[in-house]
């Protein structure tokens, strides 16, 4: 009637930035290793009602440009979001269940720049609410379908200070507003036989309303939100159960680029079309406990930065990899 799950995750990769003006020093690989952790608890209230709570890292990105031509504008940046998610699920009948959660989100943003040949670090944090609704349908004995809606999450960060860029010195606010867009996800699982299952999902994200990281110098907004568009997600996977103790998974996913043009992306948000390839395994240690591991590789579309013009350049063939381990215990 009770279950606890704990997990550890790590993300790394290569995001290489090369300036168009080769007379200037390029940042090179700006990616930093990002560790993460998660914990979940669920409890059966009665035959139809379940309650749970989760604490997990929603997303994170650490970039380190080092000592480069634009280090007076940005040298290092870290963005982290953690979520506390209490939830309820209710079984309406043998074919239909509903679920909902109210998420308390904590966001942290830091920015380090070169000021008078010294690292000047500023940071800010914010709290935001978001919500999730879900519907699970048992279509047949072998087929299940679900739909999930996640609301938009708005973070607002404000960091004030002085920045000295190539064409002059300014007293300016450096600001960033990060919004995680609302999304809808459809999913389907079909058990072919006791050993094989196939699954897939299709999703949409409202990135056209997303606030891209903004750097404002005087009255000039260097990163323009109008460059963004909605995105689509698709994934397919297979699960194989060779024995009652083992579950083996493999899958591939695609996410379309949020940018209208890959030749005009934000300096601090290099992304594009993404292909992810993953595999994992779960082992039932005892009737009450299991352990799982997973690894995945993400290939990202190349992109080009137009503004600020002095630091125009390219992110060529970026990639990320992810690894995770989790343990669950029922009691």
Indicate where each model-derived feature is located.
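Transmembrane beta-strand segments of Gram-negative outer membrane beta-barrel proteins
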Residues: 1-14
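Outer-membrane beta-barrel porins/channels
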Residues: 19-26, 33-331
